[in-house]
Amino acid sequence: MLAHQTSLARRTCLTQLGVGALLVSRSSSALAAAEPNSQAELLSRRLPTTGIEVTLPPLADNSNAIPLQFTLQAPAGQQLVGFEIIAPENPNRVILRFKLGQAQARLSFSTRIRLAMTQEVWVLAHLSNGSSLGRPTHTVVTATACFDET
């Protein structure tokens, strides 16, 4: 009798694990579909670029710590409610996503980012009316090397 109960409990547990794995895989694919997938998709949105000033070096020799600074200015009558930094060629495209606790008309931000390769980094600003602003900035990532002729 005990062997039958253990077998039943094991089957129930394995069934529940399978259902859980299925739900997790579906939710992660839905999340991936909700994020911008490519440079082409970001360009197709034709976001206005006014009010976004981005400073990113045109050439970076250390892809692990590239300085990025930007200033966001909301259009008249609007407020900034959040922003994102997106690198479409990185394995994880969304580098940073902030939702502001208090809407602001102007925001300055500075950080260091990691890039997988040469690409355009996008700064997206989300406004209180549900619209967005976006600006791409191109940077070339090189690999530094030491050449020894010995």
Please describe what each predicted stretch is.
Residues 1-21:
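N-terminal secretory signal peptides and thylakoid transit peptides that target proteins
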Residues 31-62, 94-99:
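Transition segment at domain starts
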Residues 67-74:
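Short edge beta-strand/loop segments characteristic of extracellular beta-sandwich folds
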Residues 91-114:
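An anionic, turn-rich surface loop/hairpin at beta-sheet edges
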Residues 116-120:
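Extracellular Ig-like/FN3 beta-sandwich strand-entry sites
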Residues 128-134:
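Short acidic/polar inter-strand loop motif in beta-rich domains
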Residues 138-144:
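Short beta-strand edge segments in extracellular beta-sheet folds
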